Regions:
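Regulatory N- and C-terminal appendages and interdomain linkers associated
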Residues: 1-26, 289-320
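ATP-binding glycine-rich phosphate-binding loop
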Residues: 12-44, 57
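Active-site acidic catalytic loop and adjacent metal/ATP-binding pocket
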Residues: 36-43, 50, 181-230
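ATP-binding pocket architecture of kinase catalytic cores
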Residues: 44-133
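A glycine-centered beta->alpha junction motif in the catalytic cores
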Residues: 95-109, 132, 151-159, 276-287
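A cross-family kinase active-site recognition segment
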Residues: 113-167
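An alpha-helical support segment within catalytic cores of ATP-dependent transferases
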Residues: 153-199, 309-320
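Active-site activation/catalytic loop segments of kinase-like enzymes and analogous catalytic loops
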Residues: 230-287, 298-306
Length: 320
């Protein structure tokens, strides 16, 4: 991501500048705006830091507690939120600071086979520690989230129809409804899994490779209390588009093998979560229209083939 450089003398909000200087209690050398409410702050002496705006004090405090406990229990592949600096409030955000890791020139990519395996191994290591952490976190409800997402997509039907044929839209909806019906009938199987603190947002940009080559997990904004399979499901959905035959190759990933006969997991894989999510976002901003259209139309046949294969596996398991 291109960083937009600013100094402490930049023509920004004077109230923000004043609060930042008071928070730091020293003058920064530079303040680089990375994105939205995230800044990189450097000093003449000492380590740089990241300044991030959280939606509430509770969210800052929850992540402060999580990262602290992770470090205490030996999980070091994430950042540490600075506890000696209490966050300051500005325009509805609570700004707190955390470690900055210089990134590697070689970015983490789901298209890379080794990266895919390393990423889910990191998730597993995180879960192995987080299952021993007692922390107040939201309880994740996959079915509720997906029903809301499908409902919103249906409301956006007339908007999507401007770009995609009704036949294709209806097919996406049909798979969404079929998936949810099967998922609801079988998700009780997941209650057998131990609850952990899940990451909740397994997008590629939340796996940061540091300059020393270490892969780290960042951004716990969507952390929740849930079975680890929720993170694995997200991960499987993210990497499936990079596999030639996802319905088969997903089960070659060690952490996913146990779910190849799990009906809830299989039904969930046939839910077009990315299609619904991206079109629902697009209705607010059309900047990514072309890429979402390609995913929905040009990627349609390949996705249908994957879903049909998964449906056959489900049918076979239901007969047993």
């Amino acid at each position: 991501m291109q960083m937009k450089a600013m100094t402490t003398n930049y023509q920004g909000d004077s109230v923000f500048n004043t609060r930042l200087l008071s928070y730091l209690n020293r003058k920064p050398k530079n303040v680089h705006h990375i994105q939205s409410s995230v800044y990189l702050i450097t000093f003449e002496k000492g380590h740089p830091m990241i300044l991030k705006g959280f939606d509430s004090f509770e969210k800052w405090d929850r992540q402060r507690e999580l990262t602290s406990l992770l470090k205490q229990k030996g999980f070091h592949q994430t950042y540490y939120i600075h506890q000696n600096l209490m966050p300051f409030q500005f325009k509805g955000k609570w700004y707190g600071s955390m470690d900055y890791f210089p990134p590697s020139k070689k970015k983490f990519r789901f298209s890379n086979h080794k990266d895919r395996l390393e990423g889910i191994q990191l998730l597993e290591s995180f879960h192995d520690v987080s299952e021993h952490i007692s922390i107040k976190a939201p309880v994740f409800n996959q079915s509720k989230k997906w029903k809301e997402r499908l409902s919103l997509f249906k409301k956006n039907f007339s908007y999507v129809r401007q770009y995609v044929s009704e036949d294709i839209i209806n097919e996406w909806i049909r798979w969404g409804e079929w998936s949810l019906e099967g998922f609801d009938k079988n998700q009780s199987l997941w209650n057998k899994e131990e609850k952990v603190i899940i990451h909740g947002d397994c997008a590629h940009h939340n796996f940061l490779r540091r300059a020393d080559g270490t892969l780290t997990l960042i951004d716990f904004d969507l952390m929740a209390n849930a079975p680890r399979c929720i993170d694995y499901l997200q991960y499987a959905n993210r990497i499936s588009h990079h596999l030639e035959d996802a319905a088969t190759e997903l089960w070659e990933v060690p952490q996913l093998q146990r779910y190849q006969s799990d009906l809830a997991f299989l039904y969930a894989l046939t839910y077009p979560t990315d299609i619904f999510r991206e079109w629902n976002r697009l209705n607010k901003s059309s900047s990514q229209l072309h890429s979402v259209w390609k995913m929905s139309v040009e990627g349609f046949s390949e996705r249908m083939e994957m879903y049909e294969k998964l449906a056959k596996r489900i049918s076979s398991l239901n007969r047993n």
